[in-house]
Amino acid sequence: MASNDKGLEEIPEGQIETNYDEVTDSFDSMDLKPELLRGVYAYGFERPSAIQQRAIKPIIAGHDVIAQAQSGTGKTATFSISALQKIDQELKACQALIVAPTRELAQQIQKVVVAIGDFMNIECHACIGGTNVRDDMNALRAGPQVVVGTPGRIHDMIERRVLKTDQMKLFILDEADEMLSRGFTEQIYDIFQLLPQSTQVTLLSATMPQDVLEVTTKFMRDPIRILVKKQELTLEGIKQFYIAVEKEEWKLDTLSDLYETVTITQAVIFCNTRRKVDWLTDKLTARDFTVSAMHGDMEQGQRDVIMKEFRSGSSRVLIATDLLARGIDVQQVSLVINYDLPANRENYIHRIGRGGRFGRKGVAINFVTADDVRMMREIEQFYSTQIEEMPMNVADLI
């Protein structure tokens, strides 16, 4: 922490300028403790999101970091992983303090820290208003390594000398703009005054209004600034078709015919249930098609292997459920087949959409039974898009 006020005044309000561009694109390359890495994968992460690729390493390296990121970008895990890497598990004292604007958010952060730190010997306590003060004091006396809470209660506990700050390494402010706009400015400043001078500061905020910038100039030393825009998914550049399949039972033959017509470089086939994924995998394997399957019942290790094979191209067709639609990075996939139309329209874009900046072309083919027509029309309306009947020359388009 420092009173260093050069360098940030020029930043236009609303958006910071990134001054750091190092990217680490896998968790394996972050030099994390083995038991922490195990927790990261067990939590279900496969590869780091944009903010995780940029912010985890500088925080671990000891830099003050300002990250401008919306929720949904993976920011909670960013600072949770960083905090867990930095703490000494043997030392029963608060070493990382996380402050959030609401009780709900504080509890949510605590759950993430506990889950990712599952294989580590750590305690994380949520210190929030509306709970019994005595219980809080007892929990803090036990010396949890990570404490997360709302500004009022945290300040109170430091004042009472129950939350000790002498071993504090890292102070994290999540949703700083929210916190300051809710009138917590004074408490935040007071907390800063009570922390050791050497404490490293990480600040996360969706917007950068003047009061947030003031905190950064007053209390941060040469901060690394990282701006992460939330990636918008788009259906642009994706040709969307449907095949009218009168009955559910006819879908399998339709899929086999499609296989014969089209040379598939790589495809993902989505079904709505795990049972259907397994059934379809068995049926296609029996017809001598090589496919791999993936759904939420599988162990993380097994899913990693399947994903690796698929990414490297050694497996060409992946059959999956929606659970994985959001996690599969399928930029290289030329064909997505919705064997079942998604049960809700939001998942449609997660299955077939692409990040706008990649602008990859692709083809999506929807198998539509008589019962699905209404859902398909809803999807078209919701996304203002057109799904046309699949033409005979579909092979030329893939």
From Swiss-Prot:
One of its GO terms (molecular function) is RNA helicase activity. Its main location: cytoplasm. Residues 237-398 form the Helicase C-terminal domain. Residues 56-226 form the Helicase ATP-binding domain. Keywords: ATP-binding, Cytoplasm, Helicase, Hydrolase, Initiation factor, Nucleotide-binding, Protein biosynthesis, RNA-binding. Belongs to the DEAD box helicase family. eIF4A subfamily. This is ATP-dependent RNA helicase eIF4A. The lineage of its organism: Eukaryota, Fungi, Dikarya, Ascomycota, Pezizomycotina.
